[in-house]
């Protein structure tokens, strides 16, 4: 029996949405020639919940608890962009103490997000030990979140004009203790992972993106900075009080999966530097702009009137959005998270467009995996760092 020298037939494989290594409910239709990837088609929408349309039928204050369900591993950033949009639209000033508290919470959330990227990414490559280490550090961050906000996840902590509550007594000391401890942990990660020959074999030169391609595809965050583009919104378009701290933009020029790993690990160290400076310099004063309470237009209920007797639920505060439009953005762990807001002199936004970094960054995946091996798909997908909650919205 003579065998053909080359196979003419191609195999089509579904990866996900229930694949054990898949990052959320993402489905990839992969065309294979043996182990070689010929084509890859991402299928999205399994986690679509209509978040933009929900926003257009709620007041900002009613909508605030929803936004933590976009990127549920970096919830402080979704809260920040949601309150920043009406603050910029109505020119609301933030107390300095509230701005410092926001920066501390944002950078802790960035570290937590990068940690939960690192653990599963290493597990996808076959290294199980870091997966357990990162949860050890992440729990310490969640302890800090719980002490300050009352919630380990889905914090609902940011408010228009400030934050919901001041930092509790002793919280800053605990935060500084964590910073000292975590800096040693980052060194441990790098000793354990960065020079590992098996790890380098899996990531070095895999998923290359040039600087020009990164810009043309609209990539942002570590995906962009790993390709030699020094673009970080905290530097180029400062918000909150980031311009008052001394820190450096972390970037690499190689553009492969290893470079994206190095950028994220280095960013965790820079986040610690920002947190340490913020907690040492944090000023006194109010944690919210009390003038913002002017938007609470609901009248006070009188003793024994109709509302007092029959309406158990109090009306939520209203915040009227003037007839303007603007785009606001923050540097989230995965890239540029933006909101395009259009107001029309009503309580509800006329348009609330979300610019999710994961959705934009995912578009380049088919180009990266073509002509690669099947096993490289999970390496490349893991290096992109997506959360399907913000991809599908």
UniProtKB/Swiss-Prot annotation:
Transmembrane segments: none
Gene Ontology molecular function terms on file: NAD binding; oxidoreductase activity, acting on NAD(P)H, quinone or similar compound as acceptor; quinone binding
Membrane topology according to the record: Peripheral membrane protein
Enzyme class (EC, first level): translocase
UniProt superkingdom: Eukaryota
UniProt GO BP: photosynthesis, light reaction
Localisation: Plastid, Chloroplast thylakoid membrane
Keywords attached to this entry: Chloroplast, Membrane, NAD, NADP, Plastid, Plastoquinone, Quinone, Thylakoid, Translocase, Transport
NADP listed as a keyword: yes
Pfam family for this entry, one: Complex1_49kDa
This enzyme's EC code(s): 7.1.1.-
Entry-linked InterPro entries: NADH_Q_OxRdtase_suD, NADH_UbQ_OxRdtase_49kDa_CS, NDH1_su_D/H, NiFe-Hase_large
Gene3D superfamilies, sorted: Cytochrome-c3 Hydrogenase, chain B (1.10.645.10)
GO cellular component: chloroplast thylakoid membrane
Catalytic activity annotation: a plastoquinone + NADH + (n+1) H(+)(in) = a plastoquinol + NAD(+) + n H(+)(out); a plastoquinone + NADPH + (n+1) H(+)(in) = a plastoquinol + NADP(+) + n H(+)(out)
Function, in words: NDH shuttles electrons from NAD(P)H:plastoquinone, via FMN and iron-sulfur (Fe-S) centers, to quinones in the photosynthetic chain and possibly in a chloroplast respiratory chain. The immediate electron acceptor for the enzyme in this species is believed to be plastoquinone. Couples the redox reaction to proton translocation, and thus conserves the redox energy in a proton gradient.
UniProt record similarity statement: Belongs to the complex I 49 kDa subunit family.
Subunit structure: NDH is composed of at least 16 different subunits, 5 of which are encoded in the nucleus.
Protein name: NAD(P)H-quinone oxidoreductase subunit H, chloroplastic
Lineage start: Eukaryota, Viridiplantae, Streptophyta, Embryophyta, Tracheophyta
Gene designation per UniProt: ndhH-A
């Amino acid at each position: 029996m003579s065998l053909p020298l080359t196979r003419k037939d191609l195999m089509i494989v579904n990866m996900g949405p229930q694949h054990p290594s898949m990052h959320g409910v993402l489905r990839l239709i992969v065309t294979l020639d043996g182990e070689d990837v010929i084509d890859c088609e991402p299928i999205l929408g399994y986690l679509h919940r209509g978040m933009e349309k929900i926003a257009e039928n709620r007041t900002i204050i009613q909508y605030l608890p929803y936004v933590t369900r976009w990127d549920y591993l970096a919830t402080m950033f979704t809260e920040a962009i949601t309150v920043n949009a009406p603050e910029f639209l109505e020119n609301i000033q933030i107390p300095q103490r509230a701005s410092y508290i926001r920066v501390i919470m944002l950078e802790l959330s960035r570290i937590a997000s990068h940690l939960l990227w690192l653990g599963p990414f290493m597990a996808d490559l076959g290294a199980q030990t870091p997966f357990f280490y990162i949860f050890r550090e992440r729990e310490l961050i969640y302890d800090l979140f719980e002490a300050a906000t009352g919630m380990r996840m889905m914090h609902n902590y940011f408010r228009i004009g400030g934050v919901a509550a001041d930092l509790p007594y002793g919280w800053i000391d605990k935060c500084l203790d964590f910073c000292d401890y975590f800096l040693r942990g980052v060194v441990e990660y790098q000793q354990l992972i960065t020079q590992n020959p098996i790890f380098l074999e899996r990531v070095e030169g895999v998923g290359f993106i040039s600087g020009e391609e990164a810009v043309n595809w609209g990539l942002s965050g570590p995906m962009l900075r790993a390709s030699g583009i020094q673009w970080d919104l905290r530097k180029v378009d400062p918000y909150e009080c980031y311009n008052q701290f001394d820190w450096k933009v972390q970037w690499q020029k190689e553009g492969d999966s290893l470079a994206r790993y190095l950028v994220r690990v280095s960013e965790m160290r820079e986040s610690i530097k920002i947190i340490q400076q913020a907690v040492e310099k944090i000023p006194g004063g109010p944690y919210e702009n009390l003038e913002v309470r002017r938007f609470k237009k609901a009248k006070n209920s009188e003793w024994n009137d109709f509302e007092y007797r029959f309406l158990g639920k109090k009306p939520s505060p209203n915040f009227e959005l003037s007839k303007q439009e603007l785009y606001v953005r923050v540097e989230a762990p995965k890239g540029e998270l933006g909101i395009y807001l259009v107001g029309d002199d009503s309580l509800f936004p006329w348009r609330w467009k979300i610019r999710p970094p994961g959705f934009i960054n995912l578009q380049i995946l088919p180009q990266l995996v073509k002509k690669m091996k099947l096993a490289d798909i999970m390496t490349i997908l893991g290096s992109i760092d997506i959360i399907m909650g913000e991809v599908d919205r």
